[in-house]
Amino acid sequence: MSALTDWQTAPALLALAALIGYLLGSIPFGLILTRMAGLGDVRKIGSGNIGATNVLRTGNKKLAAATLLLDALKGTAAVLVANALWGYEASLVAGFFAFLGHLFPVWLGFKGGKGVAVYIGVLLGAAPLMMLAFALIWLATAFITRYSSLSALLAMLIIPVALWVLGPEKTAMLVTLLSVISWWKHRENIRRLMAGTESRIGQKG
């Protein structure tokens, strides 16, 4: 009998998976890296976000790439560790809470990023082929429009639909929920896109 088929231990193990996921997700790599590089508080420039796109507005491409990678790995690590310890359902819980940890980190007064990199990392751990599809959609849209936010929003619209068609259903449910939350976190970006005032990739300020 696996740990999560035992009704006496499953709630505690799922709670532990959630805690591990949240703590991993809440590490603010964008803020840490920019401070270590002597660039100050990334929350005081551009969109005020702690993610890779805003780090790119410092002009340091390597730092932005490192932020993207480390933020994504938070989601991947949460999914893979929980899956190895407690199985599939626990991995989805850990991935979800890693995403929430990035969006609402306790260390920063629950004001974090918008979750795109962690979303990618969760996909890498839970549905690797869908992560590749996400990357292709993002890259194609970004190449055409130069809008990071639009690229992510489009990918987060398409990937859940693909998962509902191809399965598995529980992963589709998780990714749909992540997409809805991230779309909500991007509401100001959506307003700026509609107004034609959204910053393009590489644009400072």
Swiss-Prot record:
Secretion signal span: none
Annotated transmembrane regions: 13-33, 68-88, 90-110, 120-140, 147-167
GO cellular component entries: plasma membrane
EC number: 2.3.1.275
SMART domains, alphabetized: G3P_acyltransf
Subcellular location: Cell inner membrane
Gene Ontology biological-process annotations: phospholipid biosynthetic process
Protein's pathway: Lipid metabolism; phospholipid metabolism
EC category name: transferase
InterPro entries tied to this protein: G3P_acylTferase_PlsY
Highest taxon, organism lineage: Bacteria
Protein name, per record: Glycerol-3-phosphate acyltransferase
Provenance organism: Agrobacterium fabrum (strain C58 / ATCC 33970) (Agrobacterium tumefaciens (strain C58))
The encoding gene: plsY
